């Protein structure tokens, strides 16, 4: 080392030049540390103040906080658990089960200096509803907790331009397990929108994230939380097209009476839930349940979810909302395309209907003399119906003619040449809304006589509706029952016994005409009594299915009489059967007629030949009556004759049905 070198090996001149620069660097570093220390200490002090205040106020116990975090009480053990299953929704390690530590972790996150980008949000924005509520309770000091601009949220809310919220109920769609009870979603109504422009609003939907097309697989996985459910937002007209046009489901729109702050609170929470998912359960934690939780966040003073501990049927959840004082503003009915077409068919005679059908398929030209022979209003009605039906068929994915678009233009052109209005009355809304129908659960108290023995019976059904129930608020011809059961006590030696248990029974009786030709079908599985060769009646497990046709026929009572025919098949399994099983098939016929608005009667005849295993020929026929006392009470009278194992017996039963 040279004598004029510094210990670091630098020439002395260079060292003398760099030394001031190094001193300046050290000065700034020490100054920064001096500033950070007090700032960090100040943050810790303010966080400690907020935490202490939140504990004093017991904020973690407040209903508002528990709703924001989707906590629900444990079924057996004390405490709560959060329903959200996305890992980043709860910030504390034990935040899913500890509202207090989650609140304190949330407070700590609000001091984050993270800047908002397209991919990242500051916690004040990511959990904007939590921030707003805690700010209301604790009064955050902007000088001690800098507020972050939430530009992405503000832009999203401005796009929605919210003025109101409507609860939307598409009616039941029996051919889709996820919608066989109906469905609910929310619509954010924008400012300056009316009934004609509501289609441009946005809808908030909760559904299972799956592309599963097998209904049985979907139902099984949905029963056990096999799918992740999440919220999504899309233009309302897309949902209307899906429900009204493709699935032939009428839509009820319930405009809610929410204030501007309540709407804002709801939207802030929806923003928080954007990336969050929940385990989807078919019966309870489903679309309707989580929409109720959104409404509870919007208006914390209401309790909508506590009654739906075990199952949440969409119609029941709508009923729960409507029952809240001052919640409902008005309703609007939006008929499906199929309903509109059926309405038009009711205004025409047979020849006009046939002509419209043939025109829609291109089998008859718009210039056909049979059309021009009609009065101008009838010509217009025929062409409009042909055009509507053509578009309906196209929307369902079928191609009725080689060039449907060209035929549609031709029909529009022909209609434009007729200077006459149809003056058709609009489709009338059903007299009974879905929220005004009978309760979806039912208990029946009955007494009767079977094969010479008197009995009393208790029958229960958690959900939903059968063919003999009053149709108001439900789809006629659709039966959906889960876990129906009957218990009887007989006089004499038989005593008390379980008569039947049916975990699932679904029947769709869909009438056909020239325009609509659906198949009717049945499916049920469960345990029922079957008489065997020794005269005993074991409880036998079986699976039963059927397919058939149904029609509406004129009747003298001015009601809709339904006639149907099925080919049915049954498989039964029990060790007491010959060979341990029985396979059978056979026909069934039925008719259903409403004698008055309260009185329904139905008759049926079913025969099956069991050709494998425990062979037998069985017959069953009967007459059923139902008289409605009020919305949730009805009387039933059932008379039947059965034959099994060459033995016959009669049964008579009278019951009081209670719906709730």
Name the predicted role of every residue range.
Residues 236-311, 572-574, 644-646:
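Active-site nucleophile-His-acid catalytic modules used for acyl/amide transfer and hydrolysis
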Residues 441-443, 458, 481-483, 517-523, ...:
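Transmembrane beta-strands of outer-membrane beta-barrel proteins
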Residues 447-453, 464-466, 486-493, 505-507, ...:
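Transmembrane beta-strands of outer-membrane beta-barrel pores
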